[in-house]
Structure formats: C-alpha cells, structure tokens
Amino acid sequence: VESDKNGDDLISDILSAIEKKGDVDDTKVKRHSAYLNLEKQMREQIEALQAACTASLGNTPNDKTFVATFIFDDVEPQGVEDSTLKLYGLSNRPFKPNQLNLARIFTKLPNVAWIGDTPLDSDEIEQSLMSAAFSGALYAPHMIDKFPLYTHRINAVKMGVRITDQHKVRLGAYLGEGTTLMPGASYVNFNAGTDGAMIEGRISSSAFVGKGSDIGGGASILGTLSGGNSIPITVGRNCLLEVNCALGI
C-alpha cells in the first residue's frame, strides 16, 4: 500500500487493502498475528504511523513514499518490503527464530552502505563520494551490509535488553527480556536469539539460547548458514558454554 507523504489517506488506504482480502480466514490471520488485535491495535498502530508521517514532513524528500506491507501467507520473501517486515516480526518478538520462512532472503535485500540509519545504494554512494571530494566533507558509512542494525530499528530499552555495541546485533535477531550482550566477541545474527541469556560469544542464524544461560567469551554456536550444518541448535536454560568453545552438529 502506498500513500502520499502527508499520510492523509494512509488509514483508509490500508484498511481498504485489508478489506480486499475478504476471502482470508480472519481466525487464521489472528492466530499468526496474535500480538495484534485487528480491530483496535492495528488501527492504533496505523494512526501512530500517520502521525509519524505528518511529523516528518520537513525532513522527508518529495520523491519518497511510505509503503505498508502485509503478509497473509508465509512464503519465502518476495522483495525488500516483506523481507524487512519478517525481520521486524522477529526482533519485536511476536515470532521466534525458525518460525518464519526466510529462504533466500539474502537475494532479496540489496547490499548498501549505511550512514546512520540511512541506506545508500551504489548510485547514491557515487554521488556522496563526488560531493565529499568537491566539498571537503567526509563520506563515512559505518557499515556495508544488507541488514539494518537492531538498535536502529527496535526500542531496546523497552524490550528490556542490554547491548554494549550496536554493531553486534542485526535486525531480525530475537532478544528476550534480560538478554545482555557484553563487549568483545558477542554477536547475534538475524533469525537467531535468546530468551534472556548472557552473551559473550556468537549466536549464528537459526541458533537459540534459553533463559539464564551464559555463552562464554569467544564461544560460537553454529547456525544453518554455516557449511555442513543444517540442523538448528537450541541451548537450554541455565547452561554454560565455556570460553572459546564451539557448538555444532
């Protein structure tokens, strides 16, 4: 759903799009979106989005549009919009790792440069480099990646987690309340996470760690993106992985 940057028709546009899905089993939608009350909370969130659109008028380029995305069937990602929505679904915690179809998500997200929370594609990078060369300004992206940072998109304080280095967590990571990422070798990939653990090592995609466990400094849990490992690994509650160890199947 696309709407003008003023957001004047955003609510009606979105609700009209939902109504077009009249053949969708409403109970199924609610079951897979249990965190949303479709009659109340969705409208409240849409109104909050509308207010945000209006508030950002002065900072929004005229050629930008807002896109609202809905997923009714959990098929593999089709583009940037539904890929990003699924990553939000994990990091906001309505879904846990391995509950959403993320097959081939790498092919749907472009590799971009990030300056703050703003992604730049190849053409925009060229423009920024040229502008910096002539103006003496500094072109300094903090990373080149397909995924936004967790802390740039999620209210980590509200989620009850501690993250000592913003670059250690991608959007799409599931961090349960009480999770702490310590300085150093800690890292949580997308489609991975914890129910509230102390993380001083690496949790790869598809891996999950139970509440009260401690992943020691430099320890690594292999994920399904690792060569030769196709089985998601779960570490239970109150477990300890000692420093510099590796866990895989």
Task: Give the label of every model feature segment.
Residues V1-I154:
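Terminal amphipathic alpha-helical/low-complexity segments used for targeting or macromolecular assembly
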Residues A156-I249:
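Structural signal for interior beta-strand "rungs" in well-ordered beta-sheet cores
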